[in-house]
Structures are given as structure tokens and as C-alpha cells.
């Protein structure tokens, strides 16, 4: 079978995939890649980190973990990499091969379909690993585990990973209107009691955009990740936090977001997915709780967050959040559990 016929068959396979197929291979759907590529904060940060650090890439062997459409592979080739290897396990890979060929990078870029843990690379070691591994809540989908596997098996001593640093933050917001729409709506649906769904909705973090004027407290870093050194076990974390009210208001939810840093090379790059930063497709993760907190400026909420993958599905996150508040107007404490899926 010719390479052209293989690519045509790949297109036909994607066209025939059902919604059930997409559930297990969601990254085969071009719409997901369109959303990520059109996220200019994300894509331009990677391009700047690679293209503007040509000295880092010239003559090097580069591995892209989860290469998708191959966009990062092509950035690396443009930056002068000697060889770029892209690995992906979705049905998008043959389409990525067409893209690579159409842009005349097929002599530099080699794409391999399969799981990173199972494929055989054409080299023993690589100089640089690039990957867009972040999910909602930063750790959702568990792809960072795969990057760490590739690091431990393939990265040369003194090699580089991009991005190489990440930080996870928590803050608290006033959000009465949206809580009514998304959570309390289920108490009365066309006259019917559907409050059992409300209980489920409260346990699932909502991925959405938080407006800056909704923020009531400062933010607090609950996890810092150095991808060069962190272990898989350290991604299961327990962290204390302290949030201070910036004004008198009500609090209806906690919000989690992350920052990413490409610190290597002559021109470091960073971006934030926080409410005060420019929109990204990751948005923010909102965790509502049953009641609300009436807080005054300067008062403190203390708490602890535990986060780990679910045993049955390592892509999902199990999040436990305990908080205590003793203000002048009210006291409140709660132990909350969430399922990010």
C-alpha cells in the first residue's frame, strides 16, 4: 500500500468513527485540535519558546510526546533540529503525516503511532523533549506521567524539557448567579425535583471562564512542578492553603488555575491560565460548595487540598478539599470531595 493510500484510509477511518469511538479516542476529532491551535496564548508560547531559542535546538534530536497535528514538531524543525520524532496514539497521526509532508518536513520529522510506553524509537536517546501535556486543573488526563516516562527512558543527561516548570493556584470567588444557573437549577426543573442531579453537579468541577471582578481573595500556590526532577508519585499531592479576603463579599466557590514556564534557553517564556490573564482553552476549574461564606476584607480562609488520580481511571482526578473559616459575621468549615472527569 502506498503512503498516499494509507493516508486516505486514515481519513476514511476518522470519517466513520462514531461518538462512542470518539469517547475512547477523543483526540482523533479535528475540532479538539482546532480549539488548541486557535488558542494563541498556548500555541504562540510554544512557538516563541522553540523558534526564539534556535541555539537550543540546532543540530539536536527532539521528541514530541503526544504530537497531535505535528505543530510542535514543525516548530522544532524550523528551529534547526537535526531530527524530530513525534509520538501519538490517536487516529490523527496519519493526518499529521500528511501535514508534515505538505510542509516539506518529512525528511526531518518522523511520526510514530502508539503509546509512548510501548513504541520503539529510531534513536536510543534524545536531547530535547517537548510536549503539551497540560489538561484541565493542569493534571487532568494524566499525560504528564507519560512525559516523565519519556524523560527517564530517553532524555540524555543534561537534556532539556519544554515546558519545564508549572505551578497550580487556588483562589475564591463570588458567583451567585452562575451557581443558581448551573447548580441550584436542578432543585426545580419545570416543576420537578431533580435535586439528585444537583448533588452530582456539586461534585464535578466546572470548567469555565471566571471574570476578574468575581475574585474575592488573593491566590495561593498549592503545587509547583519541576518537570526535570519530579516523580510520578509526587503528582499525588496534599497542600495547605491560606486565602485572604480582598473585600467584603460572599464566596460561593474555589477556583483552580495554573501557570506554565519555559525557563531554558536565552529567551524564557511563560503564560498563565488564571482569571486575570488572557483567555485559554483550559479556562479555569470551579469548585462550588453547598452554602456560601460571608467574609469581610482581611479575613482568612485556611484549608487543605488532596489530589490524586482515580484508581479505576488514571485520567480522572480525585480531589478532596477541607476548609475552615472563622469570621466576624459567620463561621464555616467543610470537607468537600470532587471528581474531575
Curated annotation (Swiss-Prot):
It comes from Dictyostelium discoideum. It is found in: Nucleus; Cytoplasm, Cytosol. This is Protein arginine N-methyltransferase 1. Residues 20-315 form the SAM-dependent MTase PRMT-type domain. GO terms for molecular function: histone methyltransferase activity; identical protein binding; N-methyltransferase activity; protein-arginine N-methyltransferase activity; protein-arginine omega-N asymmetric methyltransferase activity; protein-arginine omega-N monomethyltransferase activity; S-adenosyl-L-methionine binding. Belongs to the class I-like SAM-binding methyltransferase superfamily. Protein arginine N-methyltransferase family. Its EC number is 2.1.1.319. Pfam families: Methyltransf_25, PRMT_C. The gene is prmt1. The lineage of its organism: Eukaryota, Amoebozoa, Evosea, Eumycetozoa, Dictyostelia. The keyword Transferase applies. One of its GO terms (biological process) is peptidyl-arginine modification.
Amino acid at each position: 500500500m502506498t503512503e498516499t493510500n494509507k493516508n486516505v484510509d486514515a481519513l476514511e477511518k476518522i470519517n466513520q468513527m462514531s461518538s462512542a469511538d470518539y469517547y475512547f479516542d477523543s483526540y482523533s476529532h479535528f475540532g479538539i485540535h482546532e480549539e488548541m491551535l486557535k488558542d494563541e496564548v498556548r500555541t504562540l508560547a510554544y512557538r516563541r519558546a522553540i523558534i526564539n531559542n534556535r541555539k537550543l535546538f540546532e543540530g539536536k534530536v527532539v521528541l514530541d510526546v503526544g504530537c497531535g497535528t505535528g505543530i510542535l514538531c514543525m516548530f522544532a524543525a524550523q528551529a534547526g533540529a537535526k531530527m524530530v520524532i513525534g509520538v501519538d496514539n490517536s487516529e490523527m497521526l496519519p493526518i499529521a503525516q500528511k501535514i508534515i509532508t505538505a510542509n516539506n518536513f518529512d525528511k526531518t520529522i518522523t511520526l510514530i503511532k502508539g503509546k509512548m510506553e510501548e513504541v520503539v524509537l529510531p534513536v536510543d536517546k534524545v536531547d530535547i523533549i517537548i510536549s503539551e501535556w497540560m489538561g484541565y486543573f493542569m493534571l487532568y488526563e494524566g499525560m504528564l506521567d507519560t512525559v516523565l516516562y519519556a524523560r527517564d527512558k530517553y532524555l540524555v543527561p543534561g537534556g532539556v524539557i519544554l515546558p519545564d516548570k508549572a505551578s497550580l493556584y487556588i483562589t475564591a470567588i463570588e458567583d451567585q448567579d452562575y451557581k443558581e444557573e448551573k447548580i441550584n437549577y436542578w432543585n426545580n426543573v419545570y416543576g420537578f425535583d431533580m435535586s439528585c442531579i444537583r448533588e452530582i453537579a456539586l461534585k464535578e468541577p466546572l470548567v469555565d471562564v471566571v471574570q476578574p471582578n468575581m475574585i474575592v481573595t488573593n491566590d495561593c500556590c498549592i503545587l509547583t512542578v519541576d518537570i526535570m526532577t519530579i516523580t510520578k508519585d509526587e503528582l499525588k499531592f496534599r497542600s495547605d492553603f491560606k486565602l485572604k479576603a480582598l473585600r467584603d463579599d460572599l464566596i460561593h466557590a474555589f477556583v483552580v488555575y495554573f501557570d506554565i514556564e519555559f525557563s531554558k534557553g536565552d529567551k524564557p517564556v511563560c503564560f498563565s491560565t488564571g482569571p486575570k490573564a488572557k483567555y485559554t482553552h483550559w479556562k479555569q476549574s470551579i469548585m462550588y460548595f453547598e452554602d456560601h461564606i460571608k467574609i469581610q476584607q482581611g479575613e482568612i480562609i485556611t484549608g487543605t487540598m488532596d489530589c490524586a488520580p482515580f484508581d479505576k481511571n488514571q485520567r480522572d482526578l480525585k480531589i478532596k478539599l477541607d476548609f475552615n473559616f472563622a469570621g466576624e459575621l459567620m463561621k464555616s468549615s467543610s470537607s468537600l470531595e470532587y471528581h474531575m472527569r
